[in-house]
Amino acid sequence: MAHFLALSQAATKSPFPKGVQSLFWFFFLNFLSCQIIMDSPIFLYAESLGASATIMGLIAGMTPLMVIFQIPAAAHVGRWGYKFFISTGWTVRLLFVLGLVFVPLMDGVLNPQSQLALVLVLLFAFNMVRGIASCAWFPWIRGLIPENIRGRY
């Protein structure tokens, strides 16, 4: 109990380390991109392309299913470093988001079924990279945020 109180008091007095404020912007932008890629807009777009209920279920299930790739990736994350794993994973992930941005622009070039197939491939790749890179997320954040201010952060 005394340790908890000491941490609580230290959390109210300790300033954030230099650079940690930038994480708030990262979290905000990450939240926005995830809302677009893994929430209502992608489902509405897939439905407009003629996606069946099965395809919609596949899209909904990709995110939790691809987290399974954390298991084999965990063996390599310590060797390459948490920051490298996260920054590389998030950068590659953004390439697939960029690909998704261009799919609606191909309306006259590709038929709706091909656009839907392209959306599925890009979402699969996005979620697989996200699943692999996310195994380094908590260790990296734990290393960035000192223990005495974690509750405040």
Positions of predicted regions on the chain:
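Helix-loop boundary and gating motifs at the non-cytosolic
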Residues: 2-70, 74-77, 86-87, 93-101
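Hydrophobic core of transmembrane alpha-helices in multi-pass small-molecule transporters
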Residues: 28, 96, 111-133
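Interfacial helix-capping/hinge residues at the ends of transmembrane alpha-helices
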Residues: 42-43, 138, 151
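Helix-to-coil boundary motifs at intracellular loop junctions of multi-pass secondary transporters
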Residues: 48-49, 79-80, 140-144
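MFS-fold secondary transporters
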Residues: 99-103, 107, 126
